[in-house]
Amino acid sequence: MATEGLAGALATVLGGKGLLVQSCDSEPAGKPLLPVRLRKNVCYVVLAVFLNEQDEVLMIQEAKRECRGTWYLPAGRMEPGETIVEAMQREVKEEAGLLCEPVTLLSVEERGASWIRFVFLARPTGGVLKTSKNADSESLQAGWYPRVSLPTPLRAHDVVHLVELGAKFCQQATHPLILPQELPCNMVCQRLVATFTTVQSVWVLVGTVGTPHLPITACGFTPMEQRGGIKVAILRLLQECLTLHSLAVETKGLLGLQHLGRDHVDGICLNVLVTVAFRNPGIQDEPPKIRGENYFWWKVLEEDLQKQLLHRLQESSVVPLTR
């Protein structure tokens, strides 16, 4: 991929779109990566936040024995063969009785590569709100409740933060509307837009094996990588080409993600914005030195791409990636 190709790839990722994953630049040491399979070695969860014009939140009352009678947002596990959006729509229909469409991803939460939750802001498009007369094993009922007075008892208090995240986004969008892109991937991995900036310039880390490309790091399933979360895979790749003890690395968040749960391909690629900076910057006009020949710093000269990158960095205009 020449400079023109890199510019096109960066523009695609900044626009929330996806690129096919054909190989990865960094893998965990030891055993080869196993194919990712729902219900076997990964669990993906979907959750939806609905807010209406009366500042009310759609809540469902749980039917499961361990949390029966408590209240939560519509949520549940993805099933094999589903897209992420299809899973969210199915859970909302089963638990609340409503048809819906996603507005944007609000956040992505992870506990390592084996457990990832996708939080959507969504809007109803039809259906009939579930009442206690229609109680079943999915939920007892659903209802709209004032955002400042959610029904109790709550199944878990993380919903309070998620509702507020949705309300803030409705008041003022903190990132572009971003939805999962339907592209297959056979592993859980991250495509890095790893940046180094000075007052006037922006550099992006590029992998050189094969055609120059935005580097991809595979997430492992070892106990260490699970404990450390998916940021371990980012640090592993950067450690392979940079002297990290003199650098500060920050994961800003997601520019997008891609998944297509067809033909037993359950992997996910997260497109992640990362900053690399010197711990003691002083006057630094050049990015940190690269070790080896598998990577280089690409100086972004396209004015529009420069502006987009700087805006996304300065405003943290990304989907939060939390642990």
Curated annotation (Swiss-Prot):
GO terms for molecular function: 8-hydroxy-dADP phosphatase activity; 8-oxo-dGDP phosphatase activity; 8-oxo-GDP phosphatase activity; metal ion binding. It comes from the Eukaryota. Residues 37-167 form the Nudix hydrolase domain. Pfam families: NUDIX. Mg(2+) binds at L58. Its EC number is 3.6.1.58. It is an enzyme of class 3 (hydrolase). The keyword Manganese applies. It catalyses: 8-oxo-dGDP + H2O = 8-oxo-dGMP + phosphate + H(+); 8-oxo-dADP + H2O = 8-oxo-dAMP + phosphate + H(+); 2-oxo-dADP + H2O = 2-oxo-dAMP + phosphate + H(+); 8-oxo-GDP + H2O = 8-oxo-GMP + phosphate + H(+). Keywords: Hydrolase, Magnesium, Manganese, Metal-binding, Nucleotide metabolism. GO terms for biological process: dADP catabolic process; dGDP catabolic process; GDP catabolic process. A motif (Nudix box) lies at residues 76-97. Its cofactor is Mn(2+); Mg(2+). SUPFAM superfamilies: Nudix. PROSITE patterns: NUDIX, NUDIX_BOX. Belongs to the Nudix hydrolase family. Mediates the hydrolysis of oxidized nucleoside diphosphate derivatives. Hydrolyzes 8-oxo-7,8-dihydroguanine (8-oxo-Gua)-containing deoxyribo- and ribonucleoside diphosphates to the monophosphates. Hydrolyzes 8-oxo-dGDP and 8-oxo-GDP with the same efficiencies. Also hydrolyzes 8-OH-dADP and 2-OH-dADP. Exhibited no or minimal hydrolysis activity against 8-oxo-dGTP, 8-oxo-GTP, dGTP, GTP, dGDP and GDP. Probably removes oxidized guanine nucleotides from both the DNA and RNA precursor pools. This is 8-oxo-dGDP phosphatase NUDT18. It comes from Rattus norvegicus (Rat).
